Amino acid sequence: MITLEVDLGTRSYPIHIGSGLLDRADLLAPHVRGQHAVIVTNETVGPLYAARVEAVLAGLGKTVRTVVLPDGERFKHWETLNLIFDALLQAGADRKTTLIALGGGVVGDMTGFAAACYMRGVPFVQMPTTLLAQVDSSVGGKTGINHPLGKNMIGAFHQPNAVIADIDTLRTLPPRELAAGMAEVIKHGAIADADYFAWIEDHIAGLNACDTGLMAEAVRRSCEIKASVVAQDEREGGLRAILNFGHTFGHAIEAGMGYGEWLHGEAVGCGMVMAADLSHRLGFIDVETRARIRTLTQAAMLPVVAPDLGIDRYIELMKVDKKAEAGSIKFILLRKLGSAFITTVPDADLRETLRHAILKPPTEAPVA
């Protein structure tokens, strides 16, 4: 097992990475101090892993309740969030009750938001079961739900008490979900560590095959990068925005297609290709770097050609973004591989990138 720390002073917390961690009572016990624990999971993950976590908590003498949510991004809204609140109130949960997010990014985001809101804040633990959640969304305290007009526009910063990432759970992921997680792995190399990006290029076949050793290293290095950024800028006042590389385009794809049509990681992967193209058009990266990002994204089984929402529709959607200021769209671009920054861009260059990225006719269908 590897243990990292997110250094936030009195709110610091561990990230445990390894095999068999779902059964480790010693990892959960320090963070479940009250009598009640509520596991939040979904219809897919619950049947696979909930009983194991319930057994650990029961062994600690805790009263356990499990809430099973519908599975998918399209359910990341108020009505589903209220299922968690209903369960907490029906169980008589108090301020010492610990919520446990057992699932992927949607479960983690919603559980964290519920924990932030219930009685104005209760503790929660992240137990991510998808690659995307293990390398990205479980770390950093961003929680929330979607709105029809924009992704993650309603939420709160609420740090978990711990992250327990059992890499054995990755073996049950469908290939599409595994690929979606690889988008965030690639992102971390692109924005912060060129050597890590090269390592991903060298090991992409093994990563696609979910090799245990390679996955453990990818989760470790990605969490190190994200933890370092979060420690320097918890509330996304500046540096932390670089973690949104590919997300401005990606969120527009998700909203424009309808939440759940594209997985978050698929949209981010395509968004990174678009952001790399925009970085090149503005003279920041060379054609080789742009090609490396596209090639690696495609090798990770992610889409590299965007759906045709219409250029004006893309721009409309991107204006509903947390980074936008006074109607100006902000993008995370690359100065070079391993170095990112936030900026506005000329409208003409943005439109040219969108024209270049949009899905071609069926005779020129993209490789996803």
From Swiss-Prot:
The keyword Thylakoid does not apply. Its cofactor is Co(2+); Zn(2+); NAD(+). The gene is aroB. This is 3-dehydroquinate synthase. The keyword Transferase does not apply. Pathway: Metabolic intermediate biosynthesis; chorismate biosynthesis; chorismate from D-erythrose 4-phosphate and phosphoenolpyruvate: step 2/7. Binds 1 divalent metal cation per subunit. Can use either Co(2+) or Zn(2+). InterPro entries: Dehydroquinate_synthase, DHQ_synth_AroB, DHQ_synth_fam, DHQS/DOIS_N, DHQS_C. Keywords: Amino-acid biosynthesis, Aromatic amino acid biosynthesis, Cobalt, Cytoplasm, Lyase, Metal-binding, NAD, Nucleotide-binding, Zinc. Its EC number is 4.2.3.4. Belongs to the sugar phosphate cyclases superfamily. Dehydroquinate synthase family. GO terms for biological process: amino acid biosynthetic process; aromatic amino acid family biosynthetic process; chorismate biosynthetic process. It catalyses: 7-phospho-2-dehydro-3-deoxy-D-arabino-heptonate = 3-dehydroquinate + phosphate. Catalyzes the conversion of 3-deoxy-D-arabino-heptulosonate 7-phosphate (DAHP) to dehydroquinate (DHQ). NAD(+) binds at residues 71-76, 105-109, 129-130, 142, 151, 169-172. Pfam families: DHQ_synthase, DHQS_C. Gene3D superfamilies: 3.40.50.1970, Dehydroquinate synthase-like - alpha domain (1.20.1090.10). It is found in: Cytoplasm. One of its GO terms (cellular component) is cytoplasm. GO terms for molecular function: 3-dehydroquinate synthase activity; metal ion binding; nucleotide binding. Zn(2+) binds at residues 184, 247, 264. PANTHER family: 3-DEHYDROQUINATE SYNTHASE, 3-DEHYDROQUINATE SYNTHASE, CHLOROPLASTIC.
